[in-house]
């Protein structure tokens, strides 16, 4: 008996000595089924800012994805994982939020050139979507060659389709060899630059039938900034600020006249929306900070139509070792999945020459330095305020709409250009031909009305300032509960980095952050936490410099710069 006991003690001592020399890892990180696949990282957050902070702490090549719940409020959660792990579970067919998955395009990250295209079929009975896509690819390829000396064809463009009986819808991902853009803001600048003739057609409010013949595209925009593995070289000249406003206005008229013939070649890009108003075939609202872009094989929440390979797609990816064709398509479709190799071109783009010249003139006329405003044609960075503005212009039997928004980050003012609703406080009635603007001051939490009408503008008229509803003021939007717990019908559910994605079908619908595991974030000051919240809500950071003048509003000259892109009428009301 004693001998057996001594043998056991000896074995235990030998094991203890072995594990002292070869200790177990402190954290066990299981891998996927294939040896070459990375260690698993799978963590879900309720807030986008928290997800990006977690990414910075990871050694693995992880990315942020948005998961949309199948609810009417469009609530989203944010998943941090690798491309390989996401694809591994993406194709398992689990009934989870992976069915409605979006790639989050981080600000300032290099990315591919991409497009979101759509039109309603009933409102555009003569539109040939496939032909329009082919013409757009031809146009963009020509501009890439003209401005950057980049060769591209339809065989370098991944064409994804999610069309329905009601709507034609495509995503295009351009994949020219060893070519990426500096970030998606520069992508947006490039797209707006090459589509200026079409944008002017929309602004002119002139019916433009869809062209059936080929389009002869001629460059009319300034050469953008190009970065080729080195510092940026600005190739765009800025006009002398000493020139006067009338001269620039006359020059604009001459330019519009000279390009009238060219504009007609871009008419294939003009479509009707549901209300019959003109809009672009290309959605210009998808080039914003931290944009959520729907992924290949995903559908919108509440919808069953997924993004699939289009019938007229000509792109075929190169399959690397241990990568299937389907996975290769998936990896090619990811906007931020870019590689930096020797000879990679990093493209950048400024605004069109016309806008840069006008900005230079305005800076000479105002004693301040203003950032270029953000702009868009659909949702602004503040959807709650968008809804409030729509409530102001949809009343008394009049159906108004938001034609365009502009965000002045330095002043924190949103300018909404209104269509279909022309009531003006200055004259006490609706203008006959000139549209109005609704301005929202986010700092003062008030709104007021101004006009495109020359008489009102000459008087520098603005209506009385009225307070915003408390529910949409930023001070209330930034207030969040300390615990972001979403309660299951039965009990609270935690999702940590060790949760099994296969169980997401039961837990992802009611997710919660395990705040005890993220104490490093909890220890941050309230002010820092509030700043991170603001960054998650806003699409543009507030200017970090002080203004050199005292004023309560944006000068009309600055508003005029933006209104030139829109439908303005110079006739006085009688």
From Swiss-Prot:
Q: What is its EC number?
A: 2.7.7.102, 2.7.7.7
What's one GO BP annotation on this UniProt entry?
A: translesion synthesis
List of residues binding substrate:
76, 116-118, 167-171, 291-294, 300
Ranges in coiled-coil conformation: 2-22
Zinc found in the keyword field? yes
Residue positions binding Zn(2+): 424, 431, 451, 456
The protein's UniProt keywords, in alphabetical order, are: Chromosome, Coiled coil, DNA damage, DNA repair, DNA-directed DNA polymerase, DNA-directed RNA polymerase, Manganese, Metal-binding, Mitochondrion, Nucleotidyltransferase, Nucleus, Transcription, Transferase, Zinc
Annotated positions binding Mn(2+): 116, 118
Q: Supply the InterPro entries for this chain.
A: PRIMPOL
Q: How is the cofactor bound?
A: Can act both with Mn(2+) and Mg(2+) as cofactor in vitro, but Mn(2+) is the preferred cofactor in vivo.
A Pfam family the protein falls into: Herpes_UL52
Residue positions of motif Zinc knuckle motif: 424-457
State its cofactor: Mn(2+)
Q: EC class of this enzyme?
A: transferase
What is the protein's known function?
DNA primase and DNA polymerase required to tolerate replication-stalling lesions by bypassing them. Required to facilitate mitochondrial and nuclear replication fork progression by initiating de novo DNA synthesis using dNTPs and acting as an error-prone DNA polymerase able to bypass certain DNA lesions. Shows a high capacity to tolerate DNA damage lesions such as 8oxoG and abasic sites in DNA.
Write out the domain note: The zinc knuckle motif binds zinc and is required for the DNA primase activity. It facilitates the binding and selection of the 5'-nucleotide of the newly synthesized primer and the recognition of preferred initiation sites.
What is the name listed in the Swiss-Prot or TrEMBL entry for this protein? DNA-directed primase/polymerase protein
Query: Which species is the source of this protein?
Result: Gallus gallus
Gene name as annotated: PRIMPOL
